[in-house]
Amino acid sequence: MKYIITLMLGCSLMAQQAKSDIDTLTVNTVTLESVTVSALRAKENTPMAFTNISKEELEKQNLGKDLPVLLRFLPNVVTTSDAGAGVGYTGIRVRGSDATRVNVTINGIAYNDAESHNTFWVDLPDFASSVDNLQLQRGVGTSTNGAAAFGASINLETDKASEKSYAQLASSVGSFSTLKNTIKFSTGISESGFEFSGRLSNISSDGYVDRASSNLKAYFLQGTYNTNNTKIKALTFGGHELTYQAWYGVDPATLASKRTYNPAGEQYDEDGNLQGYYDNQVDNYKQDHTQLHIEQRLSNNARLSLGLNYTCLLYTSDAADE
């Protein structure tokens, strides 16, 4: 079991351009976003290549596949899927840089693994359903995480507070017995400024590759408090993946004759004859995240923001060779 605690404290100043016409009086209205990620986001005049993706654009493709697969149509992006169906273990490369050089942040907090700096999207199934918007920066970007963002940056912002209450039930069915069920709700913003929302998801798939099955569960719970000067956002989210291992690959001869062959779990007798496959050659992994964001507007030109993050990881493996 592994625990990771992150503290992020920032203070941002907004310069106000003086008007040449001093006879004109303008009333400035400043609206704070649900979570301030301005330090990580590129603007129109920022000298870098980037793409902004809205919630509406994500929803058009969000039928159960992992987030990297939803971004596969963006320039310079190549995605992979161990199971071949876009569900389970997936990866992303941007301009040739692998996932260890693609910095991922959720509400401004780094999501990449602290040791390998890889990103395991399988541990956040259906997370796209709780993303309000994202920005992909190609090449060295604005990330505050230094060299980790050498190849690219993916900045995710989770759902904003919904003004109206709602309840949603969504299901999708696809090839290879792929099935996704999602339940979402929101209480709407109350008169006192509070809002609570959540999501439960379940995704299952047999995969294109032999025995590359996935059984994924996820949750997302969020509470917000909004006033003119104060924004508080507390959320917890996580996932549980049970996936049959399918990352070993095959030689060119096997690929030509049987593209879907999966050598994981092979069992041989004393003479070297293949007897079958181990049924429980799976990854059993849980990942939970808790975030707290507080933002206080000090004046029209300054605001103070605080971010806290707690991560809990639990991995269980019962592979045949262990």
Give a label for each model feature.
Residues Q17-K60, A99:
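Short, acidic, small-residue-rich periplasmic hinge/interaction motif at the N-terminus
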Residues S34, L67-L70, T90-R93, T105, ...:
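N-terminal periplasmic accessory domains that precede
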Residues P68-A110:
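Extracytoplasmic beta-strand/coil segments of soluble accessory domains associated
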Residues A110-R138, E157, P263:
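Short acidic/polar hinge/loop motifs at secondary-structure boundaries
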Residues T158-Y166, E195-S204, A264-Q275:
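Flexible, solvent-exposed coil segments and beta strand-coil junctions
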Residues Y166-Q168, S172-S204, V209-A246, V282-Y285, ...:
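Transmembrane beta-barrel wall of Gram-negative outer-membrane proteins
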Residues L235-D271, Q275:
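Outer-membrane beta-barrel translocator/channel fold
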Residues Y315-D321:
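Conserved small/polar residues in nucleotide/adenosyl-binding loops
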